Curated annotation (Swiss-Prot):
Its EC number is 3.4.22.37. Gene3D superfamilies: 2.60.120.200, 2.60.40.3800, 3.40.50.1460, Gingipain r, domain 1, Immunoglobulins. Residues 946-958 have a biased composition (Pro residues). The lineage of its organism: Bacteria, Pseudomonadati, Bacteroidota, Bacteroidia, Bacteroidales. It comes from Porphyromonas gingivalis (strain ATCC 33277 / DSM 20709 / CIP 103683 / JCM 12257 / NCTC 11834 / 2561). GO terms for cellular component: extracellular region. Its main location: secreted. GO terms for molecular function: cysteine-type endopeptidase activity; metal ion binding. Residues 21-224 form a propeptide. The gene is rgpA. Ca(2+) 4 binds at E517, E520, H526. It catalyses: Hydrolysis of proteins and small molecule substrates, with a preference for Arg in P1. This is Gingipain R1.
Length: 1703
């Protein structure tokens, strides 16, 4: 046991320092800079801060472990534990440095035993199990470590040489037991005349690292270095394996587009084979190029593609970035897209681009973080923290920064499901500190096998991972980090967007310092070290680790690998929008362009097609972008990125050469709710792009020209024409030949991929051209001096359109056969399109030759439209001149339309669109999807605060639904009331045009904050109050509001409801309160030039019992008028039933949206508890409950009220409660109030004292609370009728003491009244296709869904628009229900007899299922067939778990009375020697049968398995692990009711239980598999031609009477209790009807929906009900409606029947 103690020291010497009990340790700086001059003299002062001592048990008794702020123990094992503290200084580039102590102060403490150091502890070790060992130093009469100030060897960080000064303020003499405590040390670090080690040959400073230097070096002075060039960004090189070169383009284009100059280098072009040394040398050369701006390197490929640098104990990517000097400080940030396939790479590219480009204000998962910690650590860890303390410090930091939700998963008891739920619920950051393996986290055991359960599509966190070998990408299978980066669900990225993880076993303490610093940088704790990229945050975090932990920190840095893009712009909180304006058009000759932006620090970039022309940082609201490299671009892209901002992408036109492809014209955009509608006119000259006879030239890639002209003639369908033209290019009689390979497999074979030599000499094989199906000229011959070639003239060949490899041969006499030089002279997999002519014109190009390719259209001019939103393509292939998109996110968007012609695309035409309030059309809530067999069931809750947003209110509403509708066309009705509460004589007034315009009308009402006619400034407090209303169940209020003056729009108002009177004092709590913003101009009406603002529709839920509604204009002054119009109120016919699950509440806090009263005043009222935080707790549903205690560490006398929100109209309340089954008497009552929420307002309607509640056969582990066990009872359901007039319901816990607790969950209120017609319906989509609309129920079922993963979405359709879709993924796996086998159909008389075999004996509705049965452990249940009735089989299996040939035994007690006596609840079974009859006297069954109670026994299961058959029933049991080395008979696992030891476990008859032993973190554990032998229960259902004709069959045969004369399709499915199997079908063909699989004497075609039958006989077409639809001789044509049809043809007396489908 550790104990924290204080040592009384002289406070004056310690500067007021306090010694206190340890809590979470502070991290305050205790080193300051006193003086720093350019003469390279730096004075630094250390002061002791927060010195503490921890008592630990050692072989010499209790000893002390000292700690202080930022002190780190680097003492060798066996040496006294004496932390030191380090700081980095910038020093001379070349000189040796020295340190001198200028002054110091200390005190001494006598008779102190300092504990010996345990040395550096790795994270694959348990610190508690490492003993304290006193070394030789404890016999030496001197102070350790000796020097109080030292210098480390110098290092180089890019352009600055640094050196670490170390302070050792604790000096200890182990012989005299004297501890000398230096409270203050002042040192001077200065140059000497000697040349130092690791000198810096300075080239200048790249400005992008200024903040890093300021943070790293406490004496850094920017003025000491002259930057070569001021740049806001560096450069990135992507080193890519050759096989992925073509897949990286989108990533590189995006990086350039967002302002990071990015280049590509193929790894095999650096060296072949690729080596680590070659990569290292290449990066060094790139770094040393002029400009010194290489900042990022991204490696693309796995280790076998681009190897990591391997040295003893090191597997490193990071060393590639360590360039200057011989230290371990990176100059370049390194990352890796580790991939083994193109799919692996694509998902990493997609997730990175989406994260930087497409995140919006709707991404509410940002700002939510997950902290995971092991239950280990402590004094030997960084800052003396346990992993949990460490993560709590991080969690507090994140909360202070603005993170809105922190999920804490701390051992013991964390499960994979906890992690899966956290990811799938949406998180943006993960900090993990604990054990790890190559494929999993130790805490939770969440690993690569669980990744497939993640559904967090594009809601991707980045991860700071402190664990062993999670990043070992040299492992034999994908490591944990790789799995998270490659994860995807239904083609969408899941998992993580970036992770830093180690390739080796990490040390215990040093990575914690790195993780601390990463989070501090992320949360901007260091103003001089703000980093916005994942590489910048993580690398700078590791620098702090190296500074503090020296050599061990260097090793950790080298192996801590970034998986993902190091330049990734990280996001922490929900983004906000930027307002960006830029010129609509610029000149190509402009030297710069100014972009206005309201976010300083944003980066604005001009680019086109992935090429960057300029980039600048926004300063003082403007980015001035200097432009270079513009040539003839007709449109440019402006991209603006900012920290925690939505990315803005806009199009800028230029005055470049006119694009030959005409754009659309008259583009317009309108919005309705969240629906955007675009309309445009077709291009002005539709054929301009293809029929203009004037030749135009456009560069399509480097040195390749595409010329477009009209074709002289049309080609035959499906063909392309290839033309070769040359005119004595070399003037030597040589010419050219084109070779075309239709199999397209000759590139890299006959056509070389890496050279322009087709054949190296003139010994040319006669069959060289044999693989080429087509040549130009057609008789081209392979020779250096060929007979057939094109020297001066033109030849052509027509080929089938398709994919070809091709090359243009250029024979040279007496030399070789070349491939022509520049342009498209050889291509791999080139597509020649039908209807086009490809004209290759040979020319001299520079010192060589090449070709200009002209592609001519065959006379057509077809085109389609492509639509973009915010720079992202959202629809292509359109032919109509309109487009609609529903569910668009709130905010400003840019929509663009371009025309795609066959030979090119037009410039984009764009329009800005503003979509108002996403919650205007509320979506469904709590959508869930489940599947049984092939049936999918969806369930959801109605929209919250459902509006009825009708922009044109009906002046004649349907009676019974609309209570009030007022448009104020005739002024303010007499039934309305106005109150001028401020008494200035100016209240609400009617207004009419001209001057004041209503919404879509002439009149409205208004209130003034500024009066015309000399009145001037007003400070209104004006009420406009409705007539009396009757809303017993509440209602919906909608109205329209605007500011009369768009330039003075900040009018403030509120909406209130009163259930009593209509005086101002009756309106207290605002239902809606806001200040208007104009945002635009809608109406041309004006008062003295004041332009009216935009009308906004608002919706407010009115509470039950509302009698009056008031509109109050107040807290406004010196604006103008507020206008109000079209007020409508609809009554709710029935309040929706609702259930409180407490899932939105926070653990340890009062439940959200409920009122609590602690009437006894003991400070302990109702609060939320989460099973994710308490291992003894199991919620009724979800994870959260509410609880009240009568004992919690001490006896309590509770009187606690839990009060609902207003539930007016409720008739029943149903709820679930649970108590401690050992102390079940916690008394409670259900109470109601018809008035208020004070305790005195409530009366009892039901109360009880729970008693005699059983456990229900399960316990839920042991509590970590003060008094140990808190076994929870089963959940008890209660339903209580509520009297009429109930407004509030309270649960009161009282009249009890010194018991334990009562828990409540899933409280459901049933509301009364009769429903009225809804104002909306539901529409259901599957995989993007609408499958059902017009639904009014909140459930939907669909049967017969295809196997695989499906996305189901539900949207709400309102009168004026639709809600965003809410979606859920559902997986259909019908094969879990085995089908019949060998189905046959045979004639028997006039009947058809079906026969089949039963499904496979393995009962598949008992398919594999995983359930939690203990703390972090699982049971797997799957079918089996090898256990007899009334018996159970137990199997013990192992595979040399510990590698030392120790094994396991299984002990079973049929009397089930040994648990807690012979079998301890925790700890080993015994230590030392046990009674020889221990087993025989207590356990009836053993595995192995000869198991004996001896720790050295060989009667164990080491490798293999043993088994025993036992009677089904209740047993106590345990699994033992004899260990000779410790002399203990261990019990596997960690104790408690788990699969390794159990009290009263039921082994059910007819089942087999297999216990497989495994390693589990630092210990062992078991997985239990249960196989079920109960017989299958199912029946058969028979279908004929798609119609069910028989169900409930149990026999494997069926007779279909009277059906043998016709052809039919028969199907049989198996119906299980839990679902149905896939159908198995067979076609029945009667005798005399020919099999259509034979040669058919007819033709049958389906084009669209038209069926055509041609034969030399009679043909008939039937539907599947046997109705004849068409008939005739020779040819029959029928237009179908979709579905299945049958065709019968009779030719020469034989009948032929064929079934077909029409889509």
């Amino acid at each position: 046991m550790n104990k924290f103690v204080s040592i009384a020291l002289c406070s004056s010497l310690l500067g007021g320092m306090a010694f206190a009990q340890q809590t979470e340790l502070g991290r305050n700086p205790n080193v300051r800079l006193l003086e720093s001059t350019q003469q390279s003299v730096t004075k630094v002062q250390f002061r002791m801060d927060n010195l503490k001592f921890t008592e630990v048990q050692t072989p010499k008794g209790m000893a002390q472990v000292p700690t202080y702020t930022e002190g780190v123990n680097l003492s060798e094992k066996g040496m006294p534990t004496l932390p030191i503290l380090s700081r980095s200084l910038a020093v001379s580039d070349t000189r040796e440095m020295k340190v001198e102590v200028v002054s110091s102060k200390f005190i001494e403490k006598k008779n102190v035993l300092i504990a010996p150091s345990k040395g550096m502890i790795m994270r694959n070790e348990d610190p508690k199990k490492i003993p304290y060992v006193y070394g030789k130093s404890y016999s030496q009469n001197k102070f350790f470590p000796g020097e109080i100030a030292t210098l480390d060897d110098p290092f180089i960080l890019r352009d600055v040489r640094g050196q670490v000064v170390n302070f050792a303020p604790l000096q200890y003499n182990p012989v005299t037991k004297t501890l000398r405590i230096y409270t203050e040390i002042t040192v001077a670090v200065s140059e000497t005349s000697e040349q130092g080690k690791n000198i810096l040959n300075k080239k200048g400073t790249f400005a992008g690292f200024e903040d890093t230097y300021k943070r790293m070096f406490m004496n850094y002075e920017p003025g000491r270095y002259t930057p070569v060039e001021e740049k806001q960004n560096g450069r990135m090189i992507v080193i890519v394996a050759k096989k992925y070169e073509g897949d990286i383009k989108d990533f590189v284009d995006w990086k350039n587009q967002r302002g990071l100059r990015t280049e590509v280098k193929v790894a095999e072009d650096i060296a072949s084979p690729v080596t680590a040394n070659a990569i290292q040398q290449f990066v060094k050369q790139e770094y040393e190029k002029e400009g010194n701006d290489l900042t990022y390197v991204l490696l693309v490929g796995d280790h076998k593609d681009i190897p990591a640098k391997i040295t003893p104990g090191i597997k490193s990517d990071q060393v590639y970035g360590q360039i200057v000097g011989n230290d371990h400080y990176n100059e370049v940030f390194i990352g890796r897209f580790s991939c083994e396939s193109k799919e692996d790479l694509k998902t990493q590219i997609d997730r990175t681009i989406h994260y930087e480009r497409n995140i919006t204000t709707e991404d509410k998962w940002l700002g939510q973080a997950l902290c995971i910690a092991s239950a280990e650590g402590g004094p030997s860890a960084d800052n003396g923290e346990s992993d949990i303390q460490h993560e709590n410090v991080i969690a507090n930091l994140l909360t202070q920064y603005g993170y809105t939700k922190i999920i804490k998963c701390y051992d013991p008891g964390v499960t994979p499901k906890n992690i899966i739920d956290a990811f799938n619920g949406g998180i943006s950051l993960v900090n993990y500190t604990g054990h790890g393996s190559e494929t999993a986290w130790g805490t939770s055991h969440f690993g690569t096998t669980h990744v497939k359960q993640l559904t967090n599509s594009n809601q991707l966190p980045f991860i700071f991972d402190v664990a062993c070998v999670n990043g070992d990408f040299l492992f034999s299978m994908p490591c944990f980090a790789e799995a998270l980066m490659r994860a995807q669900k239904d083609g969408k990225p899941t998992g993580t967007v970036a992770i830093i993880a180690s390739t080796i076993n990490q040390s215990w303490a040093s990575p914690m310092r790195g993780q601390d610093e990463m989070n501090e940088i992320l949360c901007e704790k260091h103003p001089n070290n703000i980093k916005r990229t994942f590489g910048g945050v993580t690398m700078n975090g590791m620098f702090a680790m190296v500074e503090k932990y020296k050599k061990d920190g260097e090793k950790m840095l080298d192996t801590w690998t970034v998986f993902g893009d190091p330049s990734l712009l990280v996001r922490t909180l929900v983004p906000t929008k930027m307002q960006v304006t830029a010129p609509a058009q610029i000149n190509l000759t402009d030297a710069s362009v100014n972009v206005s932006c309201d976010y300083n620090g944003a980066i604005a970039t001009i680019s086109a097609n992935g090429k960057m022309f300029g980039s600048a940082v926004v300063e003082n609201g403007t980015a001035t972008i200097n432009l270079t490299g513009l040539t003839n671009e007709s449109t440019l892209t402006l991209t603006v990125v900012g920290y925690n901002k939505e990315t803005v992408i806009k199009t800028i036109n230029t005055n470049g050469e006119p694009n030959p492809y005409q754009p659309v014209s008259n583009l317009t955009a309108t919005t309705q709710g969240q629906k955007v509608t675009l309309k445009w006119d077709a291009p002005s000259t539709k054929t301009n792009a293809t029929t203009n006879t004037a030749r135009s030239v456009d560069g399509i890639r480097e040195l390749v020209l595409l010329s477009v002209s009209d074709a002289p003639e049309l080609l035959r369908s499906g063909q392309a024409e290839i033309v070769l033209e040359a005119h004595d290019v070399w003037n030597d009689g040589s010419g050219y030949q084109i070779l075309l390979d239709a199999d397209h497999d000759q590139y890299g074979q006959v056509i070389p991929s890496d050279t322009h030599t087709l054949w190296p000499n003139c010994s040319v094989p006669a069959n060289l051209f044999a693989p080429f199906e087509y040549t130009v000229p057609e008789n081209a011959d392979p020779s250096c001096s060929p007979t057939n070639m094109i020297m001066d003239g033109t030849a052509s060949v027509n080929i089938p359109a398709g994919t070809y490899d091709f090359a243009i041969a250029a024979p040279q006499a007496n030399a070789k056969i070349w491939i022509a030089g520049q342009g498209p002279t050889k291509e791999d997999d080139y597509v020649f399109e039908a209807g086009k002519k490809y004209h290759f014109l040979m020319k001299k190009m520079g010192s060589g030759d090449g070709t200009e390719l002209t592609i001519s259209e065959g006379g057509g001019s077809d085109y389609t439209y492509t639509v973009y939103r915010d720079g992202t393509k959202i629809k292509e292939g359109l032919t109509a001149t309109t487009f609609e998109e529903d569910g668009v996110a709130t905010g400003n968007h840019e929509y663009c339309v371009e025309v795609k012609y066959t030979a090119g695309v037009s410039p984009k035409v764009c329009k800005d669109v503003t979509v108002e309030g996403s919650n205007e059309f509320a979506p469904v809530q709590n959508l869930t999807g489940s599947a049984v067999g092939q049936k999918v069931t969806l369930k959801w809750d109605a929209p919250n605060g459902t509006p009825n947003p009708n922009p044109n209110p009906n002046p004649n509403p349907n009676p019974g639904t609309t209570t009030l509708s007022e448009s104020f066309e005739n002024g303010i009705p007499a039934s309305w009331k106005t109150i001028d509460a401020d008494g200035d004589g100016h209240g609400w007034k009617p207004g009419n045009a001209p001057g004041i315009a209503g919404y879509n009308s002439n009149g409205c009402v208004y209130s003034e904050s500024f009066g015309l006619g000399g009145i001037g400034v007003l400070t209104p407090d004006n009420y406009l109050i409705t007539p009396a209303l009757d809303l017993p169940n509440g209602g919906k209020l909608t109205f329209w509001v605007c500011a009369q003056d768009a330039n003075y729009a900040s009018e403030h108002y509120a909406v209130y409801a009163s259930s009593t009177g209509n005086d101002a004092s009756n309106f207290t709590n605002a239902l809606l309160e806001e200040t208007i913003t104009a945002k635009g101009v809608r109406s041309p009406e004006a008062i003295r030039g004041r332009i009216q603002g935009t009308w906004r529709q608002k919706t407010v839920d009115l509470p039950a019992g509302t009698k009056y509604v008031a509109f109050r204009h107040f807290q406004s002054t010196d604006m103008f008028y507020i206008d109000l119009d079209e007020v409508e109120i609809k009554a709710n016919g029935k309040r929706a039933d609702f259930t409180e699950t407490f899932e939105s509440s926070t653990h340890g806090e009062a439940p959200a949206e409920w009122t609590t009263i602690d009437a006894d005043g003991d400070g302990q009222g109702w609060l939320c508890l989460s099973s994710g935080q308490l291992d003894w707790l199991t919620a009724h549903g979800g994870t959260n409950v509410v609880a009240s205690f009568s004992w919690n560490g001490m006896a309590l006398n509770p009187d606690n009220y839990l009060i609902s929100k207003d539930v007016t109209g409720a008739t029943k309340v149903k709820y679930y409660y649970a108590v401690n089954d050992g102390f079940p008497g916690d008394h409670y009552a259900v109470m109601i109030s018809k008035t208020g929420t004070n305790a005195g307002d409530f009366t009892v309607v039901f109360e009880e004292t729970p008693n005699g509640i059983n456990k229900g056969g399960a316990r839920f582990g042991l509590s970590t609370e003060a008094n140990g066990a808190k076994p929870q009872s089963v959940w008890i359901e209660r339903t209580v009728d509520l009297p009429a007039g109930t407004k509030y319901v309270a649960f009161r816990h009282y009249n009890c003491s010194d018991l334990n607790y009562i828990l409540l969950d899933d409280i459901q209120f049933t509301m009364g009244g009769s429903p009225t017609p809804t104002d909306y319906t539901y529409t259901v989509y599957r995989d993007g296709t609408k499958i059902k609309e017009g639904l009014t129920e909140t459930t939907f079922e669909e049967d017969g869904v295809a196997t695989g993963n499906h996305e189901y979405c539900v949207e709400v359709k309102y009168t004026a628009g639709v809600s965003p879709k809410e979606c859920v993924n559902v997986t259909i796996n019908p094969t879990q229900f085995n089908p019949v086998k060998n189905l046959k159909a045979q004639p028997d008389g006039g009947d058809v007899v079906l026969k089949w075999e039963a499904p496979s004996a393995k009962k598949t509705e008992g398919s594999r299922e995983v359930k939690r049965i203990g703390d972090g452990l699982f049971v797997t249940i799957e079918p089996a067939n090898d256990v007899r009735a009334n018996e159970a089989k137990v199997v013990l299996a192992a595979d040399n778990v510990w590698g030392d040939n120790t094994g396991y035994q299984f002990l079973l007690d049929a009397d089930h009375n040994t648990f807690g006596s012979v079998i301890p609840a925790t700890g080993p079974l015994f230590t030392g020697t046990a009674s020889s009859n221990l087993y025989s006297a207590n356990f009836e069954y053993l595995i192995p049968a000869n198991a004996d109670p001896v720790v050295t026994t060989q009667n164990i299961i080491v490798t293999g398995q043993g088994e025993v058959v036992i009677p089904g029933g209740v047993y106590d049991y345990c699994i033992t692990n004899p260990e000779p080395a410790s002399g203990k008979m261990w019990i596997a696992g960690d104790g408690g009711n788990q699969p390794a030891r159990y009290d009263d476990f039921t082994f059910e008859a007819g089942k087999k239980y297999t216990f497989t032993m495994r390693r589990a973190g630092m210990g062992d554990g078991t997985d239990m598999e249960v196989e079920d032998d109960s017989p299958a229960s199912y029946t058969y259902t028979v279908y004929r031609d798609g119609t069910k004709i028989k169900e409930g069959l149990t026999e494997t045969t069926y007779r279909d009477a009277g059906m043998s004369a016709q052809s039919h399709e028969y199907c049989v499915e198996v119906k299980y209790a839990a679902g149905v199997s896939p159908k198995v079908c067979v076609d029945y063909i009667p005798d005399g009807v020919a099999d259509v699989t034979a040669q058919k004497p007819y033709t049958l075609t389906v084009v669209g929906k038209t069926i055509t039958v041609t034969c030399q006989g009679e043909a008939m077409i039937y539907d599947m009900n046997g109705r004849r639809l068409a008939a005739g001789r020779n040819t029959v044509v029928y237009t179908a409606q979709g579905g299945y049809y049958a065709v019968m043809v009779v030719v020469d007396g034989k009948s032929y029947v064929e079934k077909l489908a029409v889509k």
